[in-house]
Design a protein with these regions (language model features):
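Predominantly soluble domains enriched in secretory-pathway, periplasmic, or organellar proteins
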Residues: 1-309
Length: 309
C-alpha cells in the first residue's frame, strides 16, 4: 500500500494520500459532486470512482491522476462497484433504481441492467463469472443472480439492512454484514447455506478480509443520534473477527461514524475513515497467529469506551 485513495462524499472528487505518512498528495476533481466508492484494477493502474448524483463512474489513471473516461450507468444513485475476475466487466449497484449496471469496459457501454432486491449495495461476482451476489439494504436481503439466465434467488432475509459483501473464493465463502441487526454472516458458496458468524458493534458498515482469509475486519459506526448525519452517543470501532469461528480477536475504538475500511494487499496495514470527523487512521496489524494468541485483545475492554462521556 503506497497510496490510499479516499472519496469525498460531500466534496468534489477523490483525494490521494501517501502511506504510511498520510500526506495528501493530490485532489482529483470529478465535476461538481463527490464520489462514493473507489475500486482499483488488479494491476493497480486504473481507479474507478462512483458518483451518486450523476449516476456515473469516473475512470482515473492512477499514475497521472487524470480522468480517462466518464461512464454513464443508466441507473439511479449509483454506489458500490465490483470488477469481474477477468477485469472486462464493471458491476455497479444502483441504490434508487433497484438494479445493477453491467458495463463492458472495452466499449464503456452498459451491456444490461439486472433487476435486484430493493436498494442494492454490496456486490460480489464469483471468479468464474457465473454468479453475482447482491446485498439488499432495504429489507436485509442477500440475493444471488445467475449471470447467464438472469434468474434470482434470495438466500437470506433478515428484515434489517444488508450492507457489504466480501468473498473468499479459495475457501468457498462469502461474508456479509447487516447494519440494522449488527451481525456478520457467512455463506458456504457450494451449498449457499447461510449462518450467523458473529455479533458486531452497533451499525456495522464496511468489511474486508485479510489476504490469507483468516480475519474479517468490520468497521462500526456506533449508535446513531437523532440523525445519522450528526455525531451520535457512541464512538465508532473496528473489530477483528476470526473468519472461521466468529470469535472477536481484537478491537479498537474509532471516532465519529467509523465507515470506510481497507486492508493492504500484504496484510500489514489497516486504514479506516471516521466519516463525520473527516479523518483517516492507519494501523499496523499483526498476523493471524499473533491475534489468535492474544486472548481476545481489547475485544471486551473496548466496549466500555464506546459510549461518549
Amino acid at each position: 500500500m503506497l497510496a490510499q485513495a479516499t472519496v469525498q462524499l460531500g466534496g468534489h472528487g477523490v483525494e490521494v494520500f501517501d502511506v504510511p505518512g498520510l500526506r495528501r498528495m493530490r485532489s482529483i476533481r470529478l465535476g461538481e459532486h463527490g464520489a462514493v466508492e473507489v475500486v482499483f484494477s488488479r494491476d493497480g493502474r486504473t481507479a474507478y470512482a462512483s458518483q451518486m448524483e450523476t449516476a456515473s463512474v469516473w475512470v482515473i489513471d492512477r499514475r497521472t491522476y487524470r480522468v480517462r473516461r466518464h461512464l454513464a450507468t443508466r441507473g439511479v444513485w449509483s454506489k458500490v462497484l465490483a470488477l469481474s475476475a477477468d477485469q472486462r466487466t464493471l458491476y455497479v449497484a444502483n441504490w434508487v433504481s433497484n438494479d445493477v449496471s453491467v458495463i463492458d469496459l472495452r466499449s464503456g457501454r452498459v451491456r444490461r441492467l439486472l433487476p435486484t432486491v430493493r436498494t442494492p449495495r454490496g456486490l460480489w461476482p464469483t471468479p468464474d463469472g457465473r454468479r453475482l451476489y447482491v446485498a439488499g439494504f432495504e429489507d436485509g436481503e442477500l440475493e444471488r443472480i445467475d449471470l447467464r439466465s438472469g434468474r434470482r434467488k434470495v438466500l437470506l432475509r433478515t428484515g434489517g439492512a444488508m450492507r457489504h459483501l466480501v468473498g473468499d473464493p479459495r475457501r468457498g465463502r462469502l461474508y456479509a454484514d447487516d447494519m440494522a441487526k449488527s451481525e456478520a454472516f457467512v455463506v458456504d458458496l457450494a451449498s449457499e447455506r447461510v449462518r450467523r458468524l458473529a455479533a458486531t458493534d452497533s451499525t456495522p458498515n464496511t468489511i474486508d478480509l485479510s489476504p490469507d482469509g483468516r480475519v474479517l475486519y468490520v468497521s462500526n459506526r456506533g449508535r446513531n443520534g437523532a440523525c445519522y448525519c450528526a455525531p451520535g452517543p457512541e464512538w465508532g470501532s473496528v473489530l477483528a473477527i476470526d473468519a472461521a469461528s466468529g470469535r472477536v480477536l481484537d478491537a479498537t475504538v474509532g471516532g465519529n461514524q467509523t465507515t470506510g475500511l481497507d486492508v493492504s494487499s500484504d496484510g500489514r496495514l489497516l486504514a479506516f475513515s471516521d466519516f463525520l470527523d473527516n479523518r483517516l487512521s492507519l494501523f499496523a496489524i499483526p498476523p493471524y497467529r499473533v491475534l489468535a494468541a492474544g486472548g481476545g485483545g481489547r475485544a471486551t475492554a473496548h466496549r466500555a469506551e464506546l459510549r461518549k462521556r
